[in-house]
Structure formats: structure tokens, C-alpha cells
Amino acid sequence: MDITQLILDDHHEQRRLFAILEQIDRSDTGTLSAVWARLGSFLELHAAAEEAIFYPALLQVGIAARRRSGVEEETLDAIGDHNDIRDAVAEAARHPVGSDGWYAAVAGANLANGDHMAEEEREGLTDFRRLAGLQQRHSLAVAFAAFEARNFAGVEPVDKDPGAYVSQAEAGTPSVGDGSLNIGGLK
């Protein structure tokens, strides 16, 4: 098991759920609502798991490999992307399911999420596979899977300040109330 593969698996599921939404009749608001509730919750759970497990580890291995600026930029961008996705999900909640405003907000979430996943797959996951050993990737995969399992009912969406997040992660100090398992130091 490898954390980068678990993240890719989650990305596939996110793409699949967005595609399902696109194929549901606009008037079937009950089904749209059910699929969107699952997807919105999953987007937040995935972001929280990455923020608790993956990004602190990416910063640590990047700093150890003397690639601090690269991994800091990737992490700052990712946390900002997670905030954009949260904001789009919150915007969708302000509109009746199936309305033009709801569809626009869902499209915004899909765009923000798609851009984030593409960058993460091209940069963060690639860097992590190059910099972290297989045992560390396995240990983090176990922690990532456990985080998602423990929080399957959802986590509270909270925007994070990207700069403060990076500073705390580099210092090994978890954010208060971030749902972290405090295992960012796994080697």
C-alpha cells in the first residue's frame, strides 16, 4: 500500500462522482442531492486527510532533500486549492439543488478540484514518490486510510491559512482542531 496510490484512488472516485452528477436529470433533485451530499463530504474528508497526513510528510521529505522552496510552494498552493474547493461546496449549499446557481457552484467545485488534482498528481505525488521510501509511503497509507475510516461520517469544513499551515507543519505543530492524528513525523 502506498499513500500516493490511495490519493490517486480518491481522485478517481471524485471524478466518477462529478461525472455521475452530470448524467442525472436536472429535475431529479433527490438523486442530485444524495450524490452531491456524498461528494461534498468526500471532498472535505479527502482534503482533511491530505492536510493531516500527506502534506506534513511532503514538507519533511522535501526539506530533508534540500527542496524546501519547491515543496513549500506545492503545499501553499494545495492548501489554497482546498480552500477554493470548500468555498465552492459552501456556495452550492446556498442554492436549491438543481437550480442554475447550484449547477454553477458545482461546476466551480469541479473546476477547482480538477485543477488541484492535476497539479497534485503532476507535482506533489510525483515528488513524494521520488523523495520518500516505500516503507514511509506504506506507513502513511495506513494512517491515511485510518483517518478516512475514522472520519467516514464527515469532517467540519474549515478554511486554513496556507502560510500558517506550512509554518505549523514544518515545526511539527498540528493545527488546533484539525483532526490530525499527530503522525506527520512518520518515517
Residue ranges and their predicted role:
Residues 1-187:
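Small-residue-biased structural context
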